[in-house]
Amino acid sequence: MLNTIVRKLVGSKNEREVKRMRKACEAINALEPTFEALDDASLTAKTAEFRQRLEAGESLDKLLPEAFAVVREASKRVMGMRHFDVQMVGGMTLHEGRIAEMKTGEGKTLVGTLAVYLNALTGKGVHVVTVNDYLASRDAEWMRPLYEFLGLSVGTIFSGQSSTQKREAYACDITYGTNNEFGFDYLRDNMAFSLDDKVQRSLHYAIIDEVDSILIDEARTPLIISGPVEENVDMYRRINQLSVQLEECSDEEDPTSGDFILDEKQKQVELTETGHQKLEGLLRDAEMLGQDDSLYSAQNLGLLQHVHSALRARHLYHRDVDYIVANGEVVIVDEHTGRTMHGRRWSEGLHQAVEAKEGVTIQKESQTLASTTFQNYFRLYDKLSGMTGTADTEAFEFRQIYGLDVMVIPTNRPLVRVDHNDLVYMSGEEKFEAIIEDVKTQREAGRPVLVGTASIETSEYLAKLMQQHQIPHNVLNAKQHQSEAEIISQAGRPGAVTIATNMAGRGTDIVLGGNWEAEAAALDDPSDEQIEALKAAWQERHDAVLAAGGLHVIGSERHESRRIDNQLRGRAGRQGDPGSTRFFLSLEDNLMRLFGSDRVQRLMQALGLEHGEAIEHKMVSNAVERAQKKVEGRNFDIRKQLLEYDDVSNDQRRVVYQQRDEVLAADDLSSNIAEIREQVLSEAISSYVPPQSLAEQWDLPGLQDYLKQEFNLDVPLVQWAEEDEHFHEELLRERLHDQHRGLFTSKAEAVGPELMRRFEKQVMLQVLDTRWKEHLQHMDHLRRGIHLRGYAQKNPKQEYKREAFELFQALLGNIKHDVIRILSHVQVRRQEEVDELERERRATLERERAVSQPVHEDAVASAEAVAESEEASGESADDAQPVRRDGPKVGRNDLCPCGSGKKYKHCHGKLN
């Protein structure tokens, strides 16, 4: 109550911020006559003047009014477009490192030019991030004349470019590209052979277009550069054939009613006891499992994983919903955007299982060479901001994870769109009949209609229904993405009907009456008369559509996220145009079936609705919204869970990448090598000669063999001890360090210090890269199995942090050990040998950098498993107790506690 009164008196925080920025707009508007009076050359010269003032110590904030006024004036001259005051407010929001929520059609691309220009003045580069290559190249070409008029350079990055082309694009003042490409270039740069091979500069400032799509929807998908792994792909086919013989439980409550239980919410499969026994029998008959072997024995866990993947592929992943088959390949369909994600693959054998199900070529699994997440990549920028039409519903997540505030920017003209109440039907059949009738009604009135669907399957089903009812229409989904811009450009014509999956066509406005510019572009060198005729015809159509009520948007079902529903609604009523929206639902829709309340179902059954009758009630709308909030909350928890796990890897990644950069930048690593050599040798001696111990506790024969084997040191330790009765530990250490130092000195003298420094650098980089790749593999294995700790009453997150730290400590130790071992053994004789080593390393890295394959991790399932196991452990991260080691710490050179007789590092402490 008190909050409401205060808000009425002083306004909300958003309103106060808008008011503050509107005052700044007055200062910008006051400068307009001054800049209008300047000629083109004087206006362009302002850029150089601003840069000089920045170098002299003036801040960007101080320059803002003049810089924005310059951009506005340049835009008027070059593009014939003047920034509105609300667009100035949007530009200030972006400059301050926030998210600007602007409704569809409010000119987000033009808003971006203000903050881009101001921040590009620093010379550190500005990245404009888009969701696909089409939008990146379109926006770059559209805005290039404006930026070049102002004396700024513009570059575009896309996959397939050479390193030189990319380097040139990043060297520009402004660089356009997709989130994937920026992220992959960051990973590739950290696999570069030399500093000169890197393409990116420092990550200074980024503006993300459709920020919700990239930072929220894409947050589950890690960026992974991977290489193929040797494996038996025929295994997937054989398991796929066996999985057909397993039957789903007819009653979820009765595990004896089938072989496995499906969990549709989490897309998981659980074998029943009956199914487990049946599967073992099938595997034995197929000679894939020994007669006395168990499916759950350690060596057969991979087999069990294959079976789970095959069952999930067959029963939970559906063609034309989760993926399509195109040109003999299984291509994932993004659940949020409805777009195909070429090159992306599900992990953990799931993609291969789907390929086996569809009978297409099975591609090999891959090994991670480098990885990060969009969440952690974009947090590397000094300043980050974004634009979207729908961010307010996710404001909490933007604030908590990225530290970004959301500002809702007022529309230039009032919104007059009418959002009708949802209509809920008992069955899907009745719902689709009602949609067809609504489409017919709106077409007869001369209104264009956009029908939004959640899947390709639904869009194609609706298309068939429309064919049966002889309704002309266009379909826009992942299968027709090439013609996307053309279809969207004419979707606003009178009576036009367009069926589109979730977000297809995002970034392109539906102009009422169609787009005359697209028609003109299709003509070869059109005359002025032809253009005028096109404009006149468009104006007539435009006026007719306005009079009929504007664009009508139909939602064929509610999405899991209210934000995606709002994006669909936002296609209508742009820039103050009239428009309307309505969602048609049924109790058979996924959202209602999996998350909706039983109360709605009971109410509808109690009402005894006739076939074709719908319910339109606030209680139903509230139930739908509650279901959506429930799903949004669950998805937020999953993304947060993933981020908390990746933060551990991210800290390690930063350390390794920083060390790698230091090695690349160094010309002389001899002092580092000497320091590492002393440390590694001291640790080796301590394993056999414990510090401050009696001579009786020494293992000199063991140390002698170890030094010969590992460090090429042939020293008669036993003889030294026998010949000198005063032989003590300090003397032993001193002599061994002298011998080892002498070995390195003689190697350097044999080839010359310069060649030795080059060789040391290549060895250091090769060991670092090899061990890091192995470490990533071990981190993957650790993360996938960590949820099981919850069932042992341990907190999986704390366990993961502890074990990841131990793995990282082992990684650093192994890197040092390997570097010294290799340098101790290898003798360089000629310069050609080092040249050849450098050539081989460069070729390997170029090959690996070329294989940038985004893997669509099945992260949701693993994150949910972790959350579930944390509940099982009975504690959360907040109340977790400090983790203490159960037994004494085992050194790398100690005997392994498993009793094998091997050293720990050659047994359970071995990383590969």
UniProtKB/Swiss-Prot annotation:
Compositionally biased residues, Basic residues: 902-912
UniProt-recorded name of the protein: Protein translocase subunit SecA
Cofactor(s) the protein requires to work: Zn(2+)
Biased composition (Acidic residues): 867-878
Region (Disordered): 847-912
GO biological process, one term: protein targeting
Complex and partners: Monomer and homodimer. Part of the essential Sec protein translocation apparatus which comprises SecA, SecYEG and auxiliary proteins SecDF-YajC and YidC.
Function: Part of the Sec protein translocase complex. Interacts with the SecYEG preprotein conducting channel. Has a central role in coupling the hydrolysis of ATP to the transfer of proteins into and across the cell membrane, serving both as a receptor for the preprotein-SecB complex and as an ATP-driven molecular motor driving the stepwise translocation of polypeptide chains across the membrane.
Reactions listed under catalytic activity: ATP + H2O + cellular proteinSide 1 = ADP + phosphate + cellular proteinSide 2
Record's bilayer topology term: Peripheral membrane protein
Family annotation (HAMAP family): SecA
Listed SUPFAM superfamilies: Helical scaffold and wing domains of SecA, P-loop containing nucleoside triphosphate hydrolases, Pre-protein crosslinking domain of SecA
Residue numbers binding ATP: Q87, G105, E106, G107, K108, T109, D509
Compositionally biased region (Basic and acidic residues): 847-859, 881-892
Gene3D superfamilies documented for this protein: Helical scaffold and wing domains of SecA (1.10.3060.10), P-loop containing nucleotide triphosphate hydrolases (3.40.50.300), SecA, preprotein cross-linking domain (3.90.1440.10)
Compartments, as annotated in UniProt: Cell inner membrane; Cytoplasm
GO molecular function, one term: metal ion binding
Cofactor remark: May bind 1 zinc ion per subunit.
Keywords assigned by UniProt, alphabetized: ATP-binding, Cell inner membrane, Cell membrane, Cytoplasm, Membrane, Metal-binding, Nucleotide-binding, Protein transport, Translocase, Translocation, Transport, Zinc
Main location as per UniProt: membrane
InterPro entries associated with the record: Helicase_ATP-bd, Helicase_C-like, P-loop_NTPase, SEC_C_motif, SecA, SecA_CS, SecA_DEAD, SecA_motor_DEAD
Residues annotated to bind Zn(2+): C896, C898, C907, H908
EC number in record: 7.4.2.8
